[in-house]
Amino acid sequence: MAEGGAADLDTQRSDIATLLKTSLRKGDTWYLVDSRWFKQWKKYVGFDSWDKYQMGDQNVYPGPIDNSGLLKDGDAQSLKEHLIDELDYILLPTEGWNKLVSWYTLMEGQEPIARKVVEQGMFVKHCKVEVYLTELKLCENGNMNNVVTRRFSKADTIDTIEKEIRKIFNIPDEKEARLWNKYMSNTFEPLNKPDSTIQDAGLYQGQVLVIEQKNEDGTWPRGPSTPKSPGASNFSTLPKISPSSLSNNYNNINNRNVKNSNYCLPSYTAYKNYDYSEPGRNNEQPGLCGLSNLGNTCFMNSAIQCLSNTPPLTEYFLNDKYQEELNFDNPLGMRGEIAKSYAELIKQMWSGKFSYVTPRAFKTQVGRFAPQFSGYQQQDCQELLAFLLDGLHEDLNRIRKKPYIQLKDADGRPDKVVAEEAWENHLKRNDSIIVDIFHGLFKSTLVCPECAKISVTFDPFCYLTLPLPMKKERSLEVYLVRMDPLAKPMQYKVIVPKIGNILDLCTALSALSGVPADKMIVTDIYNHRFHRIFAVDENLSSIMERDDIYVFEININRAEDTEHVVIPVCLREKFRHSSYTHHTGSSLFGQPFLMAIPRNNTEDKLYNLLLLRMCRYVKMSTETEETDGHLRCCEDQNINGNGPNGLHEEGSPSEMETDEPDDESSQDQELPSENENSQSEDSVGGDNDSENGLCTEETCKGQLTGHKKRLFTFQFNNLGNNDINYIKDDTSHIRFDDRQLRLDERSFLALDWDPDLKKRYFDENAAEDFEKHESVEYKPPKRPFVKLKDCIELFTTKEKLGAEDPWYCPNCKEHQQATKKLDLWSLPPVLVVHLKRFSYSRYMRDKLDTLVDFPISDLDMSEFLINPNAGPCRYNLIAVSNHYGGMGGGHYTAFAKNKDDGKWYYFDDSSVSTASEDQIVSKAAYVLFYQRQDTFSGTGFFPLDRETKGASAATGIPLESDEDSNDNDNDLENENCMHTN
């Protein structure tokens, strides 16, 4: 506990639980706490009602707040990349942080990780703790090689940055200067709005800012500050010029003026003025235009390239059809801003004038309406696609006033009737180019396990999220600590079931090591203490990849052996707070360990058992050292006997002694010599350990003489009696005598070492040493690939709903874990397939790198359609979004087929290169875009007929008015697949 004393556990639990519910307010400061430390604290205070069995147990005492796991090595302030809220860290408001620090202190040498709450979004306000600050590179105009890096909040202003730069380069306030935003090798943009924030200015991670000082003659080194287009301000992203005039006047755009200085031209006009767009080579192929990375925005670039190469959607925008369908009044839309911004970007990309453009205006508009995308952190490409398709749909929804629709269950009606009804109801509220191109219909069947009630509904979809066959196993690296005190820990790699338990881990380790599974105890060691001691029935999902798992061999059956008890042991180094005070403290070091010892024992025997347990890394003295009063080892010690730790229990094992002055905890204590034990026949010796001063079978001999000080004292905790204090030592050390000591399952020992003795006799390198088993080098064979159709079949497989996601049965009037089955009823002209590579759980995150074999052409989906009237439904691939790397990071690119020349190209941010079909199918494929073959005409796109845009997803034929339905019955074709041409 903190030196000044901590609040009782109930108060701690109540206070922090309340403060965790604090609402975010712009400008407030919150603090990051490593989730591992926080979980340990939750155990200690019994935070969760189901996890109170260790409440107050010093075995789980968290100690000082330790955020080292969040920081890059060697950097006290830089966070590791791709940390995830609640999985890697917990956010606490200032008051909560101050309370925890007052109770537990902060680890020495660490600084608080404080972050501000910023407000994101323009129309949809959203407060968020800015965990990752924006790193900017600062330099002077006259010396751009001297770059200084600083981190700023998105809420910091340009004025704040300028003051910091002036401070760094010793530029006086009275000296006139101006800031420039530097792009690439020789591209500059003035930052002339001091009140604008970093977010408003669109500054991104790693951006280079240059400060320029005015010459003595009143001129500027970089020339006049007025840009070629006086209206091309650099911060605002709201276009003043109409979209049509911009798209029709690319060549004259630099000559335009903006009357209202608060607004400016769209992003690409400013880029052209300042070379943000690379001029295309002569007759650049339309559509072969890269997108600059604004700082971790490759996810957005990949999504845009896939949509840009979706012919029906791009033709719609290039032909300005969107302008007559903009819906400015839709409360679910974005006032047409997303559609307009996207349209201008597409026109620029397909103008044939640029080899790449910078989509900053579009990025800013997206961030205004979807704050989760407003920063410059890596995001999920599919999540952006979902937002963008929905945003474009609502901005272009032809329905101006959505009617209320009462949803109905099938109630035994034919599927065709129910499907028709569902699609008609959908079109009454949702009618847009996005619906025309991307929306399909699937059938959902739920069956109640109690009353057998069957519920059938038909629901529209915009894309298919297909599960990948999951790996049923995972590999874990663990360390096995043998009973033999001379044996080094051995590292193993075990293959265990993903949904298995701790017993499965023990069984797998037993097969490799020969140690019986029932003689193992599995632990998680963190920060020199036991973070967790697992029960055999606990789920393996609670073990994360970064956990240090130690398995201890114990030669007793804990369920049957009533004579022994397993106790945790931790090592602590004592220190004094100052030379003039007697107040002492301690800090943990080394690896803790478990020991099985007799319940009824004497304290001196316990001391000797502990000493022998550490003999591999506790140095022995030579005869010369002995004469000087240094340590020596007792004789006749059984190293590998018949005790629960490989020790003989009847005698007193080795004693160590020094001539150091005794302290008050062990004054005048002397242990009698006990030499009646003989060496065991199966003793294990070391390899030249005696030459290195380490305790071995041969060196561990001798007897105690005189009044000597032991290597360490130890404190004993039996929950409910005296506590073991982490910071401030208790003076009531156990005295080393023969009085009986009764131990139980809640016993805990802390061994306190004097710093001088620890330095002299404790070999930390030997203590940390371990060996590797050959299994560590084993790489599990990976399944070569799965077919896309396997994923579709898995999507349509019947499953049981989870306990956390039950279905409300209208018949039982209760939530039930029903069985659910999805079936495809109809498919759209463009089918978007999302391969679900990322998986999340409470304890772990994972990316599946399974190779999915998908066809480039002739994907026949008819076998998966349950509509009995379904005809052929074949698709060709037109685009792929790729993700390289792991969870929370990596890089996105795209393959796409150009609609004009029919060739494949590879889009990697601003770079565009040719590609071949054999490159497209890879483990990186994440989102697939397929276009139905009947919507193509040659290499181009056969445009959608606006008059037949309402093709029924139920029958695949155009919807008719009531007046015409009877006359046209004979002309209808029984087709599926939402044919719209």
From Swiss-Prot:
GO annotation (BP), single: negative regulation of antifungal innate immune response
Residues where Phosphothreonine is found: 226, 602
Entry GO CC: cytoplasm; cytosol; mitochondrion; nuclear body; nucleus
Location of the region described as Disordered in the Swiss-Prot/TrEMBL record: 216-237, 633-694, 952-981
EC number: 3.4.19.12
Modified residues (N-acetylalanine): 2
Catalytic reaction(s) noted: Thiol-dependent hydrolysis of ester, thioester, amide, peptide and isopeptide bonds formed by the C-terminal Gly of ubiquitin (a 76-residue protein attached to proteins as an intracellular targeting signal)
Domain of life: Eukaryota
Domain (USP) ranges: 289-933
GO MF terms, alphabetically ordered: cysteine-type deubiquitinase activity; cysteine-type endopeptidase activity; deubiquitinase activity; identical protein binding; K48-linked deubiquitinase activity; SMAD binding; transforming growth factor beta receptor binding; ubiquitin-modified histone reader activity
First-level EC class: hydrolase
Compositionally biased residues, Polar residues: 226-237
Phosphoserine sites (modified residues): 229, 242, 961, 965
DUSP domain ranges (all copies): 7-118
Keyword tags: Acetylation, Cytoplasm, Hydrolase, Mitochondrion, Nucleus, Phosphoprotein, Protease, Thiol protease, Ubl conjugation, Ubl conjugation pathway
Keyword Cytoplasm: yes
InterPro entries cross-referenced by the UniProt entry: DUSP-like_sf (IPR035927), Papain-like_cys_pep_sf (IPR038765), Pept_C19_DUSP (IPR006615), Peptidase_C19_UCH (IPR001394), RNA3'P_cycl/enolpyr_Trfase_a/b (IPR013792), Ub_carboxyl-term_hydrolase (IPR050185), Ub_USP-typ (IPR028135), Ubiquitin-like_domsf (IPR029071)
Signal as UniProt keyword: no
Subcellular location, record wording: Cytoplasm; Nucleus; Mitochondrion
Biased composition (Acidic residues): 656-673, 960-974
Post-translational modification: Phosphorylated. Phosphorylation protects against ubiquitination and subsequent degradation by the proteasome. Ubiquitinated, leading to degradation by the proteasome.
Function: Hydrolase that removes conjugated ubiquitin from target proteins and regulates various pathways such as the TGF-beta receptor signaling, NF-kappa-B and RNF41/NRDP1-PRKN pathways. Acts as a key regulator of TGF-beta receptor signaling pathway, but the precise mechanism is still unclear: according to a report, acts by promoting deubiquitination of monoubiquitinated R-SMADs (SMAD1, SMAD2 and/or SMAD3), thereby alleviating inhibition of R-SMADs and promoting activation of TGF-beta target genes.
Protein name: Ubiquitin carboxyl-terminal hydrolase 15
Gene from which this protein is expressed: Usp15
